[in-house]
Structure formats: structure tokens, C-alpha cells
Amino acid sequence: TVSAIDLALQKHPTPVGDLFAAIRHGRMKRCFSRDTAIRYLAFFMTSRAFGRSGFKQRFPDVQVIHPLNPELSSWQRGAVTTEYFNAHQRTVRRLRRILARKREMQKWCKKWDAMHDRYVKEREELQACKPGGLSR
């Protein structure tokens, strides 16, 4: 079965190396590193949550005036709020924890399948060499 995190964080093999895609809430970003893809996925999720809840993601934009030529003014984007930054960091940590747990579960399932295959094989061998008088 495919989990939601498998759909949100996909790995595509390419001739030049693996390509990671972060896909969530109708947004997509392709990255060359898994770390960057996790950060983008956290960004998509945090931005969506803040947008829906009405919390401010950024401080207001500020107009910066050039010190020598005042006609060359520009707008500087406001920095992210502390609440948004902390929420983003929490989301990254939670995503990493989910992925680590998933890897751990996959390793355990692999060991379980190997043990089960050995058991079935041994059982079939015992059934094949069973003496005729036994009813079991």
C-alpha cells in the first residue's frame, strides 16, 4: 500500500542521479537532494496551515530607499514570523521522524518475511519426509 508520505515525497531515478519531488496541496517542487525536498514539503504544509488559520506568515514588506539616490527605492520582503519559523522546524522534524520510523518498519518487515520464508521451507521439507504412520 502507498502511504500519504510516499505520495508527498517521491524519488525518481534519472541517468544523472536521483530526483526527489515534494508534492502537496497542489504544489510541486523537484529537488536533487532529499533534504531539500523535505524542507519544501514542510514549507508547503506549514504555509497551507498558516494560510487556512489566518496566522501571519511574514512581517509586512518595507520600502527601502537608496542612501545616495532616493529615486532608486525598492521593496524588501518582510521576514518570516517566529511562529512560522518554529512551526516549519517542527514540521521538518516530524517528517524526518515519520520517515525514520517507516525505514525501521520496512527493515523489520524484511526480517519477518525472511524468517517466514525459512519457516515455510523447513515445514515443507519436514512434510515431505514424514513417515507414513503419522496422522499429523
Task: Label the model's feature ranges.
Residues 1-136:
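Intrinsically disordered, low-complexity linkers and terminal regions
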